Amino acid sequence: MSKNDLLKILKEQLKTDGFIIDGIFGSYARDENTDNSDIDILYHLEKEFYTKYSGFIGFKKLDEIKNLISTTLNKKIDLAPKNNLSKTAQKYILNEVEYV
């Protein structure tokens, strides 16, 4: 099973919590990844997330989600929140996102 297929499965599991995986970017999206590459994941949060996980509990949940994805894919991952990207990050990241 490919990493993209696994991401689609994770996306379905996590969306009930209001955590939405939009896609990947970086070396994996450009097919330039190496064995040492991490996987960069673009995501956004929906209202359900804030309702279920308010305050610091939300930060803990994000860390749990990051660990779940990393363990499932057996890779280090970086999470980038779509709604909080700087203008510079938007310019580079949004142009190369491979949506799942």
Located regions from the model:
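Catalytic core of pol beta-like nucleotidyltransferases
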Residues: 1-23, 29-35, 48-100
